[in-house]
Amino acid sequence: MVKLTAELIEQAAQYTNAVRDRELDLRGYKIPVIENLGATLDQFDAIDFSDNEIRKLDGFPLLRRLKTLLVNNNRICRIGEGLDQALPCLTELILTNNSLVELGDLDPLASLKSLTYLSILRNPVTNKKHYRLYVIYKVPQVRVLDFQKVKLKERQEAEKMFKGKRGAQLAKDIARRSKTFNPGAGLPTDKKKGGPSPGDVEAIKNAIANASTLAEVERLKGLLQSGQIPGRERRSGPTDDGEEEMEEDTVTNGS
């Protein structure tokens, strides 16, 4: 594992990404802890922490400029409190393929008032009953969850399910948090799927080349790594078209 030092930050790749944001690439260093980001001098719109060994999402200084945080393919099982104080303008958070287990572990995301684009795909918590409705209720500012637009019908269903004393009790009952944090403990892993055919790989690469947002690029890369093909992956939310979120012209999900 590699300690995230000021020297590493200075040496890491820095570039203007596909959506013209200034990005810091800290991908694949096997970093275990987020620290020393004050060395960035708040000069980046996006930071890529993909493919590291991070277990807890915290340790950020005040980064007013940061809008996009990619933390897929880590080992995150906890989300720190008070992220809104450090990341007031965060709009996109990609937590795909981590180790979040309990619905209550997602509660700290509610404080991120600018968060509109969130992915928690391939975390054990997504298998919990009422997962999607719980996140929609607890983090109502999110407009796109797991790469699916939040529908007005879903918001109404979430409000109905969790409102009032009975709803509050239901939310409390299903939202327990992980009680222990053991750095050496084993974490859930997904079974490996068969790889895609060469034609499928080429289709995904073409889709990546035509992607219009950084989050979409990361989703397609994740599909390529897991052997899934765009349009064939299992949907984690409702499959009906439903009525889309009202006030669509106010949505700012990075596209």
Curated annotation (Swiss-Prot):
Keywords: Acetylation, Isopeptide bond, Leucine-rich repeat, mRNA processing, mRNA splicing, Nucleus, Phosphoprotein, Repeat, Ribonucleoprotein, RNA-binding, Spliceosome, Ubl conjugation. The modification N6-acetyllysine is found at K172. Residues 123-161 form the LRRCT domain. It is found in: Nucleus. Changing Q148R: Results in defective spliceosome assembly. It comes from the Eukaryota. InterPro entries: Leu-rich_rpt, LRR_dom_sf, RU2A, U2A'_phosphoprotein32A_C. GO terms for molecular function: RNA binding; U2 snRNA binding. PROSITE patterns: LRR. GO terms for biological process: mRNA splicing, via spliceosome; RNA splicing; spermatogenesis; U2-type prespliceosome assembly. One of its GO terms (cellular component) is U2-type catalytic step 2 spliceosome. Identified in the spliceosome B complex. Identified in the spliceosome C complex. Found in a pre-mRNA splicing complex with SFRS4, SFRS5, SNRNP70, SNRPA1, SRRM1 and SRRM2. Found in a pre-mRNA exonic splicing enhancer (ESE) complex with SNRNP70, SNRPA1, SRRM1 and TRA2B. Contributes to the binding of stem loop IV of U2 snRNA with SNRPB2. This is U2 small nuclear ribonucleoprotein A'. It comes from Homo sapiens. The gene is SNRPA1.
